[in-house]
Amino acid sequence: MVRKDRRPNVLLITCDQWRGDCLSAAGHKVVRTPNADALAAEGVLFRQHFGGAAPCSPARACLYTGLYQMNNRVCRNGTPLDARHGNIALSARSLGYDPTLFGYTDVSPDPRTLAPGDPRLRSYEGVLPGFTVRQLLPEHQKPWLSWLEARGIDSSAGFPGIHRPADEIVAATTDGAVTTSPPVYSKDETPAAFLTGEFARWLGEQEGDTPWFAHLSFLSPHPPFIVPEPYNKIYDPADGTTFRRAANWQAEAQSHPYLAYELGQQQRANFRPGAEGKVRDWGDDNFRRIRALYYGMISEVDAQLGRIWQAVKAADAWDDTIIVLTSDHAEMMGDHFMLGKGGFFDGSFHIPLIIRDPRRRKAAGASVDRFTEAVDIAPTLLDLLGEVFPPHLDGQSLKPFLDAGEPDNWREAAHWEFDFRSVADADAERHFGIGPRQCNLAVIRTKQFKYVHFAGGLPPLLFDLEKDQDELSNVAADPAYLPVRLELAERLLAWRAEHLDQSLALAELTEDGVVGHVAGLPLFQS
């Protein structure tokens, strides 16, 4: 029963590197996600949801702050988040919640707020201000490794060695072949299972009349690509959609200077510990085996979602809990001979989004095909909690969709940004002969077209998605498409002009004092 005399609970679940098309509820012909599907059956599935940036830190900055990268300025993993920006955790805390974290947020702290020798300045994996940490699980995964040791599992290999096959068959043989052998830990001992158990224990400690706010941040299906039995075998490598790619990687590299650079950068060891060589040189059989493992990792996370649903129901909180399930960014998974995330392809930025608000059943089971973005999450949660979200945020509330309606003047395109500067080693800067401020791109994607604009003199891209769903033919220089290119370039420029930082621009000092909106700390107070 929904209790109307108090604020609802909030459960924000993020996965890492989950493609938006890899949900059975979204019509995927291979991947099975019964627990995510069950959530969609009681909530709303947003089919055209896109992340705002990549990799993890930039993507999460968009999600947590409700600001585009052009305004939050988190460009890479390790770029500090300006302390003047608030976020959804600070906002929830101002509303009386104690936002509690299970996992990680990958938010680097503002160095100006810390002493020069502060150890938090030596890692990009800081904690978003506003969160109480119940169980931290950063990339080194040491808390989970200690938990494995306590269960009798030898975890001395550390990270990422723990994610190599248990039978000591290395991740790549002399010919580079990929094995689907399982790791030393079981399906009940994965990092996701560990975090789920910690959340369930914490949930059992909560007072029934006090609303809670929890954020579960799962690393999976992020690499290393390995998964325990039975998930390593439930998908046949021969199954799956056709890879979206040219005839060979050389053709991809010749299509644009950025793709040539990225294909040369990707190392197998970043995805399969112990593997040698470049990702681009793997054959289709290896890409298919990796894809089968990736699908298995998604199903393993989905099984943990089932445990979470059971825990929330056992706590008699199911009818009082808003649940948001999404990802930070997606995964190329063999498309264009690449793995990982970044660049401009849909494969890196199209992500899942399911929202269930038990107070809003009118649209239960519906799906939305309008473009939604990661920056919409923060204003949506505020709106669902009864707060007026401030006008300087870049995102918009999805609440009308949850009420089986549609907001006025909704966007007709998705937008995202990608910054490929490398401040620590200046690799990209040297390669392209440009400065760090020029190592970036911006995308506008409509239902029919995608336009990609690069700084630094790199050539633009234009794809006719109705004729070229795989994004293989750049028509930016085709005279027949010049009017389209001009229109989209103008729309992209207008989008950037409209979303210039409004933190103080919406306020004015008058004889009567401050008029308008001032963004303060926390961000969502005026």
PLM feature spans:
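Short beta-strand micro-motifs enriched in acidic
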Residues: 452-454
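Formylglycine-dependent sulfatase
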Residues: 1-450, 460, 470-490, 517-526
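Short, charged, surface-exposed hinge/linker loops at domain edges
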Residues: 501-519
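A contiguous, mid-protein "functional segment" used to position or interact
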Residues: 482-506
